[in-house]
A protein has these predicted regions:
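C-terminal cap of metal-dependent C-N hydrolases
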Residues: 359, 369-405
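Alpha-helical scaffold segments that flank or form the walls of functional sites
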Residues: 62-63, 71, 81-140, 164-179, ...
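Active-site core of metal-dependent hydrolases
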Residues: 174, 178-298
Length: 405
């Protein structure tokens, strides 16, 4: 006898389900209810025979991953989070979802305070609309804002305009974060935080903090970690190089087991052997990011990041003075690249784009793995590793091409 099926119940059957703890896969069934994962079964679920065909989706052994989590991304699909209006934000979020990313932290580069406040207001308005039925399955989830500027070291500014940088002022930061509670993560050059007040204030406001765009010595970085910083923004990039007489922030991060290290695995930002070094030392705290900019998913040409002109050629973005200006990487490609560069399993690489970023920004109890109680964010892959279907909050976006550019 078939059981009465609650509204919004679906059993995904005959799947190769990702196991975050084992960094591997097992054949089983996944029961979803009300936008959440209700049950994960190894083998055939006892519920399978009791449910009507309409409530069972047999995926034919396809791989089912948690939705990917990108916590450092400035934009894609022709839009930048710093300037995008409501319509462009919808286009961008649809493009993220189609690529397999179900959760994003819109990342804002350095700008004047008024411009940052306005960008966060627009992003907040977009996030507030997520419960609208008309948007179900149409876009990735916004989990808060990553504030990458303005508190950076001018000597390691990268593509950030120097006139937009500011000293590390704890009072300014607190006013900023209290007025804009959507900021979840802050990048800062913490060697400029002489008395530690900036870091303490950020933590007291509920943000996580990463060291980045920094000239920090080994000792300065270790002090920042001891005081509460939990991550290093795009390891190796916009930091002093690893040196045998001065390890610097890179060495400090690699030797600190509890510090998350972000990597851009596009084959351009970091040499494969340096990716392998980080993978060997970091394991659970290696976090794949894209640092993507508006040209992602678009042809080569002229673009902008943080108001600065950027030329994209052969998929590589540079400012006119030659600085690397973000990437055009998709996170799923980053997963594949990481596995190839570091010589790790696909399952290990998936962890770095799902559970590890969720841990970095304090979202591991909500997303990042396929466990009961977590949000039903899924990525189902074809045999060739491309997205077959993407689900966000229990709703499929339909064809993986929907919203793509």
């Amino acid at each position: 006898m078939q059981e009465r099926v609650p509204l919004f119940m679906l059993l995904i059957a005959n799947a190769a389900i990702y196991d975050a703890a084992a960094r591997g896969f097992f054949r089983g069934d996944l029961l979803l209810e009300g936008g959440r994962i209700a049950e994960v079964s190894r083998g055939i679920s006892a519920r399978r025979e009791k449910l009507p065909d309409s409530a069972v989706l047999d995926v034919g052994g396809r791989t089912v991953l948690p939705g990917l989590v990108d916590i450092h991304t400035h934009g894609r699909a022709g839009g930048d989070f710093g300037s995008a209006d409501g319509a462009m934000l919808e286009r961008m979020l649809a493009s993220y979802l189609a690529s397999g990313v179900t959760t994003v932290l819109p990342t804002l580069a350095s700008a004047e305070p008024t411009a940052l406040r306005e960008a966060i207001r627009r992003i907040g308005e977009a996030a507030a609309q997520e419960s609208a039925p008309s948007l179900a399955g149409r876009r990735a989830h916004i989990a808060g804002v990553h504030l990458e500027g303005r508190y950076l070291n001018p000597a390691k500014r990268g593509a950030h305009a120097p006139e937009l940088l500011a000293p590390l002022d704890a009072d300014e930061l607190e006013g900023f974060l209290r007025a804009m509670p959507g900021v979840r993560h802050v990048t800062a050059a913490l060697e400029l935080d002489a008395d530690g007040s900036f870091l303490r204030r950020a933590l007291s406001c509920g943000a996580t903090v990463g060291l980045g765009h920094s000239t920090a010595t080994y000792e300065q970085a270790m002090r920042a970690f001891a005081d509460g910083a939990t991550a290093v923004t795009h390891l190796y990039n916009a930091l002093p190089p690893l040196h045998h007489r001065a390890g610097g922030a890179v060495c400090a991060a690699l030797l600190s087991p509890d510090i998350s290290c972000e990597l851009i695995c596009d084959g351009f930002h970091i040499a494969p052997e340096m990716v392998r070094l980080a993978a060997t030392l970091k394991r659970e705290r290696l976090v794949l990011i894209t640092d993507s900019m508006e040209a992602t998913g678009c042809p080569d040409g002229e673009y902008r990041i943080a108001g600065m002109p950027v030329t994209v050629k052969d998929g590589k973005a540079r400012t006119h003075d030659g600085a690397i200006a973000g990437s055009t990487l998709s996170l799923l490609d980053g997963v594949r690249n990481y596995a190839a560069f570091a010589g790790v399993s696909f399952g290990t690489a998936v962890y770095a784009a799902t559970m590890a970023p969720a841990i970095e920004v304090g979202l591991e109890h909500e997303i990042g793995s396929l466990e009961p109680g977590k949000r039903a964010d899924l990525l189902i892959l074809n045999a060739d590793g491309t997205p077959a279907q993407v689900m966000c909050g229990g709703v499929f976006c339909g064809s993986a091409n929907r919203g793509a550019v």
